[in-house]
Amino acid sequence: FNTDVLMALHRKQNLSPLLQAVKEHRVVNPRGTEPFNVKSMFEVMTGSFKDRFHQEIVQRTPWTRQFYQRQTEGPDGETISDLIEWTRGHWNDLVLKPERGYSGHGVRVGVVNNDIEEAINLALSEGDYIVQEKIPLALWAEEIPYLNNEQIHIKQYQTDFRCLMGNTGLVGFVGRYGGVPTNVGSGGGFQPLAILGSDMSVRDAVVRVNDTIMNMDPGELLDVIAHQKNMAMDCDFTYLLGPVKIALRPRLITAGQIEALENYGEKLWADCLTLENLWLSGQLDDLIRIEEEELEIARMNPWQGSAAIIASDGLFGFGAEPLE
């Protein structure tokens, strides 16, 4: 959890032993990752500092700006004289979200949330929001079977895919599916991962797997779902009151795509070190809006490339999105 959550708990429960562990560098992730782990850092990577980062990382990062009345540069390099008015006029292509948050709380998405005035008022009243270029929802949409009233159906879900990087390289992935946003706290679930070993395309493989599931006996599929729930409970794979939802079809990726993601992860890790250096040198002071108490904790435990897990859902597709 973020350091602001840590401090809120500390004020209620006295977590001095945990803070001492932070000071002694016994916590993963180091709290020093926090200042450059906020969503406003996407502005650094798509703004005036973008030449400091790998071109691939910049290209796979959506245009982002801290949201308040200001002049700035738009997604295509155009001058924006008033960001709030510009957001109002381009809402269908944008997203507003808190700089720090989880479970999709406070996120507003153009088209999905049509009331632009409510979205803008929320962002301005809460403060510390970003406005971000909306990624075409179809890029991460997948058709996945589901069971309802003992009948099998196909539904188009939104998915996301996160690479997990450590100091030794790429260490794993997390796939989620659901609505918009896909956060588990907003009713989403997890999608397992399978590596496609044949020469067929990802889309053809997805169609074949979906067809196979659609032709199953609903009773057999009920047994599969029950088995998923039991495994989730046995492994403490739960959220709040019960087992996390698990998709009936895995996300399919190829060995070549994994190799490309390993390369992406190496570059991202290096660029995170660049972000930390920019923060430590004071060059990001105008962008990082964190209370001084939290910054003191971050300074207790600088990262500097030590053991950590960094998650990223950069802009990449895998070929499973539905054809228009």
What are these regions (language model features)?
Residues 1-324:
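Preference for protein termini
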